[in-house]
Amino acid sequence: MTTIAVIGGGQIGEALVSGLIAANMNPQNIRVTNRSEERGQELRDRYGILNMTDNSQAADEADVVFLCVKPKFIVEVLSEITGTLDNNSAQSVVVSMAAGISIAAMEESASAGLPVVRVMPNTPMLVGKGMSTVTKGRYVDAEQLEQVKDLLSTVGDVLEVAESDIDAVTAMSGSSPAYLFLVTEALIEAGVNLGLPRATAKKLAVASFEGAATMMKETGKEPSELRAGVSSPAGTTVAAIRELEESGIRGAFYRAAQACADRSEELGKR
């Protein structure tokens, strides 16, 4: 039976735990560490997992160790648990869920030959609809990578990418839910401005985003094709699209994505 250690029981760590248990993993095979004793007890009571405060204890004989801590703590935690990982009877795989920390930095902080996987998650994994990209280190074999992918698939889709694409991936997936939340927020405000009750405007906007996303995913059609299907000549939708285009919506997204990628690259150099 696979044993999982989750170092850090924040939002991402809890989402992972929730997904694993929903996929019928035995909670007693999941160890979660927290700095806060209260938070640890909360997760234990909610999911029945093993709550620990010692990272090395959690990593002891764990098959996969997920690092769900802030980027600034990744190297510190790796240094803390590397001795334990060296003594495990089978090779453990370390999976970083933090932005900005390269595979090279992690491999240099651990013992030689440690299998390391770098993941860029996003927050929709909190509701089982995440998008996680995975990048394997030099010492990760095909079986280990497949195991990590299977575990991550419990909280959404998984895609393997090259590390050179991580900054672009951050802009397109890691941070993009926030862009869509902002667009939804603006659409709700527009509805209120038109006289709709806020609750009604929110329901309409959220349902429209959900439906549009499902159409793009399930029909296989290009977004431009689906948009054209809603845009009758000289109709209401065309009038709205014209205003958005003239307001520079495409350029705004280009610039936002570039700014995000640039910032990701900058953080990765620290």
Swiss-Prot record:
Q: Which reaction does it catalyse?
A: L-proline + NADP(+) = (S)-1-pyrroline-5-carboxylate + NADPH + 2 H(+); L-proline + NAD(+) = (S)-1-pyrroline-5-carboxylate + NADH + 2 H(+)
Pathway stated in the Swiss-Prot or TrEMBL entry: Amino-acid biosynthesis; L-proline biosynthesis; L-proline from L-glutamate 5-semialdehyde: step 1/1
Which biological process terms from the Gene Ontology are attached to this UniProt entry?
L-proline biosynthetic process
Q: Which domain of life is it from?
A: Bacteria
What cellular-component terms does GO give this entry? cytoplasm
List the subcellular locations.
Cytoplasm
EC supergroup of this enzyme: oxidoreductase
Q: Which InterPro entries match?
A: 6-PGluconate_DH-like_C_sf, NAD(P)-bd_dom_sf, P5C_Rdtase_cat_N, P5CR-like_CS, P5CR_dimer, Pyrroline-COOH_reductase
Q: Which SUPFAM superfamilies match?
A: 6-phosphogluconate dehydrogenase C-terminal domain-like (SSF48179), NAD(P)-binding Rossmann-fold domains (SSF51735)
Keyword hit for Ribosomal protein: no
Keywords, in A-Z order: Amino-acid biosynthesis, Cytoplasm, NADP, Oxidoreductase, Proline biosynthesis
E.C. designation(s): 1.5.1.2
Q: Which GO terms describe its molecular function?
A: pyrroline-5-carboxylate reductase activity
Q: What does this protein do?
A: Catalyzes the reduction of 1-pyrroline-5-carboxylate (PCA) to L-proline.
* Stated family: Belongs to the pyrroline-5-carboxylate reductase family.
Record-given protein name: Pyrroline-5-carboxylate reductase
State the species of origin: Corynebacterium glutamicum (strain ATCC 13032 / DSM 20300 / JCM 1318 / BCRC 11384 / CCUG 27702 / LMG 3730 / NBRC 12168 / NCIMB 10025 / NRRL B-2784 / 534)
The UniProt gene name for this protein comes to proC
